């Protein structure tokens, strides 16, 4: 039978029962201790020593701990790994309590509610997401608790997952919360598991009615205009969860807006990923992305906003032109741009600092950073007052100088305060008379103590006597054993050491009481003054947040201006005629990182008159994919208001950009490369509009040649007949170039090639016309395939080309000179024509059965050799 638990362990188990999903950091003196399974997890994840503690059980309870003053870094590590941490503090002074100190959880830290400076990536948002399902809709809410921003999105078609997946890809939440009763469909779970690592799904219960939940949101946010009741309910559930987790005021969460669809360019999951807008494909980092090129921001707020702009560009012409005008003004006024940027460089992340003011976790160094940030606001406003563009004048109007708060912080906070309030010396001398008096007493005490020591030495002749202090019995005099016989009678022995004796005196004890009392009073008064200062700042948090958002916009515009100036970008003309006309456009990312080459510029012309669909054929490695990605990236740049790398450009905004480039298996869902490709194409054909930009690269390559060709042609025809979106379609199926004869708005383009013998140079220029070969052997030679393989491939290629010519001649005779490589709208399928008899030959039957895409290169060459030998035996060459 187990022994009864100790009182402390009973208290721990009671609290732990209410926080079973969290790792409980249980405060014991100067440490946070973890027990049982929590200790096993923490010791493994933090690489700290696992010990045991007698708690009443027959066996020692597993335990580990971290110093409370260093706990923040340990907690951040656990949270980044996907754990939730509950902080259980001592709510009473152990010195003033007999028995067990009262303890309770003061806050819970989760991946989506981190507020500390080091716990969040300063240049990225950290979103918590709520999924709320009602009868006919999903409501998604995304909240960055550290900045106070809330975005909501109502999806009325519950079966259409694309809107949900696109929103999740844009905001990339670190935690998803689910009100009680919400059950995620399996395909949504699969998407979340596949796209996000260490994400936490947090179900939570509430005893409030739906009406009470909605009313809570209305009370908190005020008038947000007309919204569905279920949106208010979703916002209310978010607030209830945050209050339960943070356990403090959250009025700083006040910047609410809807995820705009009508006036935003929608970039779906695939486009964001394959265009490498904010994360690269290599390791998910920023290096080599469009964000990497454009991000010259100087403030964390600006960095976060630029990322949002890139992931959600504008479609409204007036808004785009307003941004362009601001960028243009900052480019032409170099002195003002440099001055503004030098001032922005002095600004800290006070958007998040005021969030910590609200929740009570603001540090003295945070307030110093806020003070230094506010100090430069008048100078920024002075520079902006000379600007003429609407965006810059609007920013100036939104920035307040917050003089009252700045003056308060300047007078109240020490120039170099301690890291924590407990260390003292946070409040500046001269701010509070009572505090000054107590500090004077504490400071002068050292002088008084030195004088007392000197007087004792003179009166007793004990020249080696010295004063000291420890926590056990306070101040003391220390005398060596050899001199202990000379101490006066009023000395009271308190401790015997190996080589000395320690004494106190009535006068020394009286001094100690006065000094320690002063120190305790200093700590208490500094804490009181600090809290009052925090309360004063809380009164203007909303205004300070608006200033931070205005500065973020200024920082982004300044960043775009600097990049545009340094890289010699031009301002594209924004038009509404449906045309994209870019002359000598360049890929901004590749151009930046090219070391030894000059990037070859290309024109991009798309319109609804005669060049709506560009069918691009040509060699691999020649630049087709770069050209298409370049078109999409330049559109994104133009639609955020940026200048672009080109000689000149006029651009009509597009509503969506779709990309299907690259191919890979989706192992997590058991889907092959071809299935993934077909699903992506189906999504594009279902969602693309007349105003969309469609990028399709090598559709149909994941299946047999005839299947792939048929699918590719059918996709081309569907877009040309039904969607009429501006399209760039790269393909290795050269047979498709004949479609130019059937569709007036389809034009063939290819990559210019210069041949000299067996040497081939890809000129990287996109020109009108179609390609009749892929130069695959040349690419293989560049890739380093053995010469023996290359020579064998050339022999096989020559043989296949001869057979192809024979078939083409027969085809011309049968069809009266018309090519049936591609089925034109008025021509029967090959299988329905006399030409179909060609494919009854056993060799051709065998060829049709070959799955080339599943073979290695060597296996493919061997198979070709076998078929060639079989053909020779049947009477071939």
For each predicted feature, which ranges?
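Conserved phosphate-binding elements of NTP-dependent enzyme cores
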Residues: 2, 10-14, 21, 534, ...
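Charged, surface-exposed helical/loop "interaction arms" that form contiguous linear patches used
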Residues: 359, 363, 373-376, 429-430, ...
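C-terminal tails and terminal domains of large nucleic-acid-associated
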Residues: 838-877
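Amphipathic heptad-repeat alpha-helical coiled-coil/stalk segments that mediate oligomerization
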Residues: 206-217, 265-266, 281, 372-447, ...
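ATPase nucleotide-binding head domains, primarily ABC-like/P-loop NTPase cores
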Residues: 36-39, 228, 232, 298-299, ...
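Extended, charged coiled-coil "arm/hinge" scaffolds of SMC/Rad50-like chromosome-maintenance ATPases
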Residues: 497, 501-535
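Charged catalytic and DNA/RNA-contacting regions of genome-maintenance
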Residues: 1-329, 345-358, 362-454, 581, ...
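Active-site phosphate-binding and catalytic loops of NTP-dependent enzymes
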Residues: 88, 111-120, 249, 388-391, ...
């Amino acid at each position: 039978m187990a022994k009864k638990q100790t009182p402390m362990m009973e208290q721990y188990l009671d609290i732990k029962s209410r926080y079973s999903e969290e790792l409980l950091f249980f405060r014991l003196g100067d440490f946070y201790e973890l027990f049982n399974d929590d200790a096993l997890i923490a010791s493994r994840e933090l690489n700290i020593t696992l010990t045991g503690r007698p708690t009443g059980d027959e066996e020692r309870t597993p335990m580990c701990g971290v110093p409370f003053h260093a706990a923040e870094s340990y907690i951040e590590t656990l949270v980044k790994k996907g754990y939730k941490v509950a902080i259980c503090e001592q709510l009473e002074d152990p010195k003033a309590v007999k028995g067990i100190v009262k303890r309770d959880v003061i806050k819970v830290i989760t991946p989506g509610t981190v507020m500390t400076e080091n716990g969040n990536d300063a240049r990225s948002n950290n979103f918590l997401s709520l999924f709320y399902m009602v009868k006919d809709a999903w409501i998604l809410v995304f909240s960055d608790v550290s900045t106070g921003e809330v975005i909501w999105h109502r999806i009325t078609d519950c079966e259409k997952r694309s809107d949900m997946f696109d929103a999740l890809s844009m905001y990339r939440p670190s935690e998803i919360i689910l009100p009680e009763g919400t059950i995620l469909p399996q395909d949504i779970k699969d998407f979340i598991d596949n796209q996000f690592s260490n994400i936490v799904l947090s179900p939570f219960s509430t005893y409030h009615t739906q009406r009470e939940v909605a009313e809570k949101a209305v009370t908190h946010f005020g008038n947000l205009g007309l919204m569905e009741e279920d949106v208010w309910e979703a916002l209310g559930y978010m607030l209830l969860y945050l209050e339960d987790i943070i356990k403090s005021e959250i009025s700083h969460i006040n910047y609410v807006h809807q995820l705009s669809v009508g006036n935003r360019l929608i970039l779906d999951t695939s486009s964001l990923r394959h265009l490498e807008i904010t994360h690269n494909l290599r390791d998910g980092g920023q290096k080599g992305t469009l964000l990497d090129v454009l991000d010259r921001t100087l403030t964390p707020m600006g960095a976060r906003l630029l990322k949002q702009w890139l992931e959600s560009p504008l479609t409204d012409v007036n808004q785009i032109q307003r941004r362009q005008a601001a960028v243009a003004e900052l480019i032409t006024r170099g002195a003002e741009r440099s001055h503004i940027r030098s001032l922005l460089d002095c600004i800290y992340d006070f958007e998040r600092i005021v969030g910590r003011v609200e929740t009570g976790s603001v540090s003295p160094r945070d307030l110093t950073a806020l003070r230094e940030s506010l100090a430069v606001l008048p100078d920024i406003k002075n520079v902006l007052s000379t600007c003429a563009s609407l965006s810059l004048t609007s920013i100036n109007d939104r920035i307040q100088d917050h003089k009252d708060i700045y003056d308060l912080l300047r007078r109240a906070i020490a120039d170099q305060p301690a890291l924590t309030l407990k260390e003292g010396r946070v409040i500046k001398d001269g701010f509070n008379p009572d505090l000054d008096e107590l500090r004077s007493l504490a400071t002068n005490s050292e002088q008084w103590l030195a004088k007392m020591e000197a007087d004792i030495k003179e009166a007793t002749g004990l020249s080696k006597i010295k004063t000291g202090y420890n926590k056990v019995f306070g101040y003391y005099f220390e005398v060596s054993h050899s001199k202990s016989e000379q101490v006066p009678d009023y000395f009271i022995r308190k401790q015997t050491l190996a080589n000395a004796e320690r004494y106190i005196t009535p006068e020394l004890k009286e001094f100690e009481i006065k000094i320690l009392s002063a120190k305790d009073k200093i700590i208490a008064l500094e804490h009181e003054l600090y809290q009052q200062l925090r309360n004063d700042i809380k009164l203007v948090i909303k205004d300070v947040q608006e200033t931070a958002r205005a500065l973020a916009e200024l920082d982004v515009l300044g960043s775009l201006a600097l990049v545009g100036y340094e890289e010699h970008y031009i301002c594209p003309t924004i038009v509404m005629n449906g045309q994209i006309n870019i002359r000598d456009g360049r890929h901004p990312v590749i151009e930046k990182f090219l070391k030894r080459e000059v990037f070859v510029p290309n024109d991009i012309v798309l319109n609804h008159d005669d060049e709506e669909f560009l069918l691009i054929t040509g060699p691999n490695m020649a630049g087709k994919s770069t050209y298409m990605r370049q078109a999409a990236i330049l559109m994104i740049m133009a639609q955020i208001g940026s200048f672009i790398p080109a000689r000149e450009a006029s651009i009509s905004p597009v509503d969506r950009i779709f990309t299907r480039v690259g191919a890979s298996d989706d192992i997590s869902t058991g889907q092959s490369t071809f299935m993934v490709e077909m699903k992506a194409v189906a999504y594009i054909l279902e969602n693309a509009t007349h105003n969309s930009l469609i990028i399709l690269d090598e559709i149909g390559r994941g299946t047999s040649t005839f299947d792939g060709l048929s699918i590719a042609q059918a996709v081309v025809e569907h877009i040309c007949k039904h969607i009429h979106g501006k399209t760039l379609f790269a393909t290795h199926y050269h047979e498709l170039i004949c479609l130019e004869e059937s569709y007036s708005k389809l034009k063939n383009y290819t990559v210019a090639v210069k041949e000299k013998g067996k040497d081939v140079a890809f000129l990287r220029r996109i020109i009108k016309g179609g390609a009749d070969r892929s130069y695959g052997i040349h690419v293989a030679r560049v890739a380093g395939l053995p010469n023996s393989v290359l020579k064998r491939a050339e022999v096989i290629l020559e043989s296949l080309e001869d057979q192809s010519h024979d078939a083409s001649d027969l085809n011309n005779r049968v069809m009266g000179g018309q090519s049936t490589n591609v089925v034109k709208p008025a021509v029967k399928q090959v299988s329905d024509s006399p030409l179909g008899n060609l494919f009854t030959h056993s060799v051709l039957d065998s060829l049709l059965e070959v799955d080339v895409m599943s073979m290695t290169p060597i296996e493919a060459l061997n198979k070709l050799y076998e078929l060639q030998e079989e053909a020779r035996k049947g009477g071939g060459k």
